[in-house]
Design a protein with these regions (language model features):
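Conserved catalytic core of the tyrosine transesterase superfamily
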Residues: 1-204
Length: 204
């Protein structure tokens, strides 16, 4: 099976493709020309190459299932993502980013600083960091357990000494029960994915 988030992504992709392909047509009516026209329409609409590649990947998976079930013989070519160079932080920017905020900063700014440090140290996914609970952090062993992973399996990850020190101080301020979320809102609740994204952008 796939995660709820993956299913939601598939639904969104198919909804977007519906503007470029008649989703009401039967398999008998679906042709290679129709698929080619869909790709041409996507390109003309100004959709980025990487987005088209993502849409095509989902639709190709759907067609693969349809072929296995005997509904169609059609397939969609593999569209490569257009390589883009992502900017990285300079040493000066990284030092400024990781500089600890002033002691009189509010909880959100302090929490965001800890989150940025954690992400740089671990590189974990947004869904993973949002689901970490206080009890998942073992400061004595310098390890953290990821409950929410892409594979659905628990994962134990080591912490560097500096990150363990940062978390130790943060957790003494954050407090809360073992089952509470480590990186929470000011009300002690789980941060939404959008809230986490906005918090990181605002801190940057």
């Amino acid at each position: 099976g796939v995660s709820d988030k993956t299913v939601l992504t598939y639904n969104r992709h198919f909804h977007s493709l519906g503007y470029h392909l008649d989703m009401t047509m039967t398999f008998d009516e679906l042709t290679k020309e129709a698929l080619d026209s869909m790709l041409v329409s996507l390109r003309k609409s100004g959709v980025s190459s990487n987005t088209i590649s993502s849409y095509a990947r989902v639709f190709r998976t759907f067609l693969k299932w349809c072929r296995a079930e005997g509904y169609t013989d059609l397939s969609l070519p593999n569209i490569q993502d257009k390589e883009t160079v992502k900017g990285s932080y300079t040493d000066e920017e990284l030092i400024a980013l990781l500089r600890k905020p002033a002691k009189d900063c509010d909880f959100c700014e302090y929490r965001n600083w800890v989150i940025v440090n954690f992400l740089i140290n671990s590189g974990c996914r947004a869904g993973t960091i949002r689901n970490i609970q206080n009890r998942d952090v073992s400061l004595s062993d310098k390890r953290v357990i990821y409950r929410h992973t892409k594979t659905g399996k628990l994962q134990s990850v080591p912490l560097c000494s500096q990150m363990a020190k940062i978390l130790s101080e943060y957790m003494s301020i954050r407090g809360g029960a073992p089952e509470d979320y480590l990186f929470c809102t000011v009300y002690g609740e789980m941060m939404s994915e959008n809230a986490l994204s906005c918090a990181i952008k605002k801190y940057n």
